Structures are given as C-alpha cells and as structure tokens.
Amino acid sequence: MIRTTRTKGGLLILAIIIGLIIGILVPVQTSVNTRLRGIVGSPFLASLLSFSIGTVFLIVLTLFVERNFSLNPGVWSEPGWIWIGGVLGVIFLTGNILLFPRIGGVQTVIMPIFGQGLMGLLIDNF
C-alpha cells in the first residue's frame, strides 16, 4: 500500500509539473503565432502554417510511438461531433492570434483559462 501511494504521489507530482509546463507554453505559443502573423500578414495563414507544422510533428511522433496509423474501424460509426476537436483547436489558435495584439498577452491567456474553468464547471455538473 505504501509503495502504491508513493508511486501515485510521484506520478501526481509529474502530472502537475507537466501541466505547469503546458501552461507556460500556451502564452509562448500565442506570442510566436502572433509574430508569425506579422510576418505572413494574415492570422489565418499563420494558423494554417502552425497547424501544418504541428501535423508533420504529430505524424513523426505517431510513427515513433505507435509505429503505425491504424484506426479502430468502429471510429467511423461514432457521431459526427466527435471530429470537432480540430475545428475547436483552429478557433482557439486563430482567436488567440487575433486577440493578442488587441488586448495583450496577459488577458489573451487569462480569458481562455477563465472560459475553460466555466465550461469545466458546466461539464462536471451536467
């Protein structure tokens, strides 16, 4: 029992550290993508480039970790809303690129976090 508790505690600390690192990277990503917008002249082109590079990275990562691209055939019979995650990612990324120069870095990071907290409460309660 003690050994399991230590392992779970160690994993919890690791998860917290990873969460903090991800939190640190969100404003960095927004800042980098806003700079990219200035270079290419369009928030949508900046988002497209960012997602394209991310897609290439995910392909390499998937091949390295999973060793293949096979999907469970049952995935195609799932409801259509299951595929909306990518669209929501584009809205989030492009929205941040549009907001950053208008409201600044702090509010561009804080408002989505506040929204996530509100939505998390709704999801947990309904």
Give short role names for the model-derived ranges:
Residues 39-42, 95-111:
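Structural motif at transmembrane-helix junctions in multi-pass transporters
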Residues 2-21, 35-38, 44, 53-81, ...:
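Membrane-interface interhelical linkers
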Residues 116-126:
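C-terminal transmembrane-helix exit sites in multi-pass transporters
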Residues 24-32, 72, 76-103:
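Hydrophobic alpha-helical transmembrane segments of multi-pass membrane transport proteins
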Residues 49, 111-112:
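Hydrophobic core positions of alpha-helical segments in small-molecule transporters
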Residues 54-58, 92, 119-120:
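Alpha-helical transmembrane segments of multipass membrane proteins
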Residues 26, 42-47:
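Membrane topogenic helices and adjacent juxtamembrane segments
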